[in-house]
């Protein structure tokens, strides 16, 4: 990722630059099994947020990238609970590791305007209270944000409900969006 957060005396400042992109990242599922459950949960929530904050865009004609983002979201939704239930599940960690890499490398933002409102809100909250883990803060902010903005583009949220969360197939877009947000919680 080209992004970082600097925390200093109760404030958090986000920065972004190609100059801070790592030259290499080693994604070794054998190492993930030692993570505490709270950090597994927080990491999964951060992955979901990184994709959603690109996916929930009003930019048109992003079908290919949308499909890839939806596949990554489905993977994280499927395997996140599995690694939490069994941190030694190597195969599930392989899926999470790859999906997480794509979630953070910017590929799902290709050709679209991105919205980082949830991250901006969460940085303020955890800057004020440093005991709040970033991903845990996002787990609270994301569904609330979704509920507040889904009326702006109900079709996008209905697509998310149907294609990612597997709900709302027979509902109109507004109802499907509400079902998808509830399932996401």
Model regions and ranges:
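A glycine/threonine-rich phosphate-anchoring loop and its flanking beta-alpha core
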Residues: 1-64, 159
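Active-site segments that bind and position negatively charged phosphate/pyrophosphate groups
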Residues: 54, 58-182
């Amino acid at each position: 990722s080209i992004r970082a957060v600097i925390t200093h005396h109760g404030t958090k400042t986000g920065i972004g630059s190609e100059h801070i992109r790592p030259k290499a990242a080693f994604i070794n599922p054998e190492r993930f099994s030692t993570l505490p459950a709270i950090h597994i949960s927080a990491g999964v929530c951060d992955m979901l947020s990184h994709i959603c904050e690109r996916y929930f865009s009003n930019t048109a004609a992003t079908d290919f990238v949308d499909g890839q983002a939806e596949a990554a979201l489905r993977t994280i939704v499927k395997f996140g609970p599995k690694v939490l239930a069994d941190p030694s599940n190597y195969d599930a960690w392989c899926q999470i590791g790859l999906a997480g890499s794509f979630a953070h490398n910017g590929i799902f933002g290709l050709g679209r305007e991105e919205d980082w409102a949830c991250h901006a809100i969460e940085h303020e909250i955890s800057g004020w209270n440093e005991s709040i883990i970033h991903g845990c803060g996002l787990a609270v902010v994301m569904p609330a944000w979704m509920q507040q903005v889904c009326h702006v583009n109900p079709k996008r949220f209905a697509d998310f409900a149907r294609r990612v969360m597997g709900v709302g197939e027979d509902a109109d877009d507004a109802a499907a969006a509400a079902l998808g947000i509830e399932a996401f919680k």
